[in-house]
Regions:
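Surface cap/lid and interfacial helix-loop subdomains adjacent to catalytic sites
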Residues: 45-46, 56-83, 101-188
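Active-site machinery of serine-nucleophile hydrolases
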Residues: 1-76
Length: 188
């Protein structure tokens, strides 16, 4: 139901609504659901052992899922738009930052690109190690993340590579889930 609520909200009040004043009302909208904890950057399946000895398999397949979805959609839409907006909020904003360069290439390098990341800030010292060891993120993505801010590192690398891309990054402490995640990162 969470995806349905989010899809409804985007369609009714967000960038996907059909209101006359919405400058994006005639755009094609592709929603990539976020669901497995790897910010759309994983290509790995990993088994973990809990403290009680039980094992669990986690499928960090976010990058693979995103690529399959977008390339399949190209059967139905133009893969070379004049303009491209890559955006996401909360956990999805991490994916927007990390995948922006990849998405630009997938859409054949449009001339007018904007990347908007909304409320995607988590400070963690070992993001690079997570991308390498846990998620097995593509090299081009993980190699730009060297600090404690995965979003900022990804956006700075995007700007250094593509100076013409417009980058917007806004953040709020009102995202309860991200605030809780940061407390967990900080205090365990």
């Amino acid at each position: 139901t969470g995806l349905n609520v989010m899809t409804y909200a985007i369609k009714e009040w967000g960038i996907g609504n059909s209101a006359e004043e919405n400058i994006l009302k005639d755009w094609t909208f592709i929603g990539v659901p976020y669901c497995n904890g790897d910010f759309h950057a994983g290509t790995n399946t990993k088994e973990y052992t809990a403290l009680d000895g039980r094992t669990k398999t986690i499928y960090y397949e976010g990058y693979n899922n995103y690529r399959k979805l977008v390339t399949k959609i190209f059967d139905y839409i133009n893969d070379s738009p004049e303009q491209l907006l890559v955006t996401g909020s909360s956990a999805g904003g991490f994916g927007a930052a990390i995948l922006a360069d990849d998405a630009i290439e997938l859409f054949n390098n449009p001339q007018d690109v904007t990347v908007h990341v909304d409320s995607s800030l988590l400070i963690k010292e070992d993001w690079h190690d997570v991308m390498v060891e846990e998620w097995k993120s593509p090299k081009a993505m993980r190699d730009v993340v060297m600090g404690d801010n995965i979003t900022l590192d990804s956006l700075v690398a995007l700007h250094q590579k593509r100076t013409d891309v417009k980058i917007l990054f806004d953040c709020s402490v009102r995202d309860f889930n991200l605030s809780q995640a940061q407390v967990f990162f900080d205090n365990g």
